[in-house]
Amino acid sequence: MKQDDLGIKDAADGLSNSQRQWLQIGGLPPECVDDGFYLDRDGLANEMTGWTYPYHLIDFETAAVALPFHKGRRPYEQVAFQFSHHVLESDGSVRHQDEFLLAEPGVFPNYAFVRALRAALIGDQGTVMRWSHHENSILNAIKTQLLEDAAPPDDMAALIDFIDSITKGGPRAMVDLADVARRRYFHPSTHGSNSIKKVLPSVLISSDFLKAAYGQPCYGSAKGGGIPSHNFTDMLWWRRTEEGVTDPYKLLLPVTANAETPAVNQGGAATNAYLCLQFEDMPDAHRLVTEKALLRYCELDTLAMVMILQAWQHWILQVN
């Protein structure tokens, strides 16, 4: 196949879809071969000038089921039961700042969820970042739920104002890092995917900074220079294998020692874990380890965003 066969078109800003397709088919341009990836350093650096520290990286876990668990809710209505929140400061320091999980059987979590998210983010005007459109869609769905509620909470207006401020079109609209990756970054190992589960291993294998930073047990370490974490202690994220580097999501252990119980290491498993938690007859010990697995998984999602940002930042600095 030749470039002409794809009808390649330039994008207004960054890579177009057809240009990404050609990188996947034709390989990296000569000037990118030594790096092993394509990064629009100038475009990314310019885009970053519009961001404000501290950076707030957030990720949600949600469910939408045919038979609602909560009284008065509709089939397939969005339920937001969990979020994770990392902060990246201008000096490069990182911390797992906040987390939220409400999986008590019969308790509709959405309003408490957005209330906790608001409390986590209103302390400054730092840029809020997500991966893909999911978080934006969920917040808008919660806004609709608030507006349609016959007996809304007393703080409905404040919650809606907050949602409007960080969703698309708002004065503090979230930055979609998946969209940034689509326009600015391509690594052959992702096979064209912009899933965070594909992008994270690609930056880990290529970034000397990440190797140095996470190739030692600093995450969740109480020692000087350690990265504060709610759910990990002395965690080593960068681990060499014969094939390259271990995918961090594969380091998340199964909920129980039962081989038939899968690890919570992707969104579908997180949703299933939440659904299991809605059954009141779940033993307390199993409930505890399931909730812990959910917390660890969601924390890794926002840490993954931090790592990707750090890799991009240091690749820009290497040139500039």
Each predicted region: which residue ranges?
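DEDD superfamily 3′-5′ metal-dependent exonuclease/proofreading module
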Residues: M1-N320
